[in-house]
Amino acid sequence: MAKKVAYPVILKPDQEGYYVEIPDFDIATEGDTIAEAMEMARDAIGLMGIDMEDEKKSLPEPNSKAQNVEAGDTVTLVDVDFTEYRKRVDNKAVKKNCTIPYWMSVEADKAGINYSRVLQDAISNILGLSLIHI
């Protein structure tokens, strides 16, 4: 799955600001200003995308659905980096069991090593990811 994608959105002015249709995901959101509406669209796409990823579903291709554009509407693209979005909003800690030699455990305990931090740093380094410590 591509992790950074730009999807078309349709901004429709209304009495309260802007209604935003996101055709590729069959969802909508809204915002008081154009900037807020676009940020809400990015958030909606991000949430939908990581939910789909968790459910092992494929993300829709950009422009995969017809757009219903009317006079006064604005069509633009909203980019979403799903990897960065997940790091920002889905940062809950999970327990993982690992096994190390006893002697290493003794030495690490003496040194006050934080096992969770070491494991996070090592995995991030191996995967080439920037890390947000939890």
Question: What would you call each of these model-derived segments?
Answer:
Residues A2-A6, D43-T99, W103-A111, R117, ...:
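Short, charged, surface-exposed hinge/linker loops at domain edges
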Residues I132-I134:
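Conserved small/polar residues in nucleotide/adenosyl-binding loops
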Residues P8-D24:
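Short aromatic-glycine-(Arg/Gly/Cys) micro-motifs in beta-strand/loop hairpins
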Residues L129:
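Phosphate-binding active sites in nucleotide-utilizing proteins
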Residues F25-A35, N97:
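A short, exposed loop/beta-hairpin motif centered on an aromatic-Gly-Thr core
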